[in-house]
């Protein structure tokens, strides 16, 4: 779709044989998701690469998504122009990341990224292509069963976005590992 808005829905049980079944799978430009719940899917939200796409996700809960292979995540944003991720609770990613984004600009504000006591996430926030990223006022907690100890990963797959700048301001990091 193009310029899609989704509000106040629950997505659960989305699975396909190639292990990337998503509550929402967006290939076109423009996506706004508000006040939704995504749980027990292979991916909560999965988007393609679209250079003119702006994505806004706010007030949502993502939990227990992932196929357990480390390649599926609570939220996986492809190479888009901008992601705004605000006021969400992303927890219990099944070995994948609670948020993975390849966006050129990421504005990540006032979220909770949590493993709790029994979560097994990998990175809490993965920005594999770097870019301009603002992490402001978030709570990031790795539980004792987390797959690894990295809370925020930046440009680990190559700094290919045009601007490289990471701002981490007024966040709370908790490691229970």
Locations of the language-model features?
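Glycine- and acidic/polar-rich repeat regions and solenoidal domains
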Residues: 1, 7-177
């Amino acid at each position: 779709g193009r310029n899609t808005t989704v509000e106040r829905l629950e997505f659960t049980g989305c699975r396909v044989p190639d292990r990337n079944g998503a509550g929402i799978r967006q290939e076109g430009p423009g996506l706004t998701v508000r006040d939704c719940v995504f749980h027990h899917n292979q991916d909560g939200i999965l988007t393609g690469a679209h250079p003119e796409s702006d994505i806004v996700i706010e007030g949502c809960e993502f939990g227990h998504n992932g196929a357990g292979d480390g390649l599926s995540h609570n939220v996986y944003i492809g190479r888009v122009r901008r992601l705004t991720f605000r006021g969400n609770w992303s927890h219990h990613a099944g070995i994948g990341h609670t948020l993975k984004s390849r966006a050129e600009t990421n504005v990540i504000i006032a979220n909770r990224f949590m493993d709790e006591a029994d979560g097994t996430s990998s990175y809490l926030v993965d920005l594999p292509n770097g870019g301009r990223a603002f992490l402001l006022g978030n709570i990031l907690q790795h539980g004792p069963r987390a797959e690894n100890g990295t809370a925020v990963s930046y440009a680990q797959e190559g700094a290919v976005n045009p601007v490289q700048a990471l701002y981490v301001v007024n966040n709370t990091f908790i490691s229970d590992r």
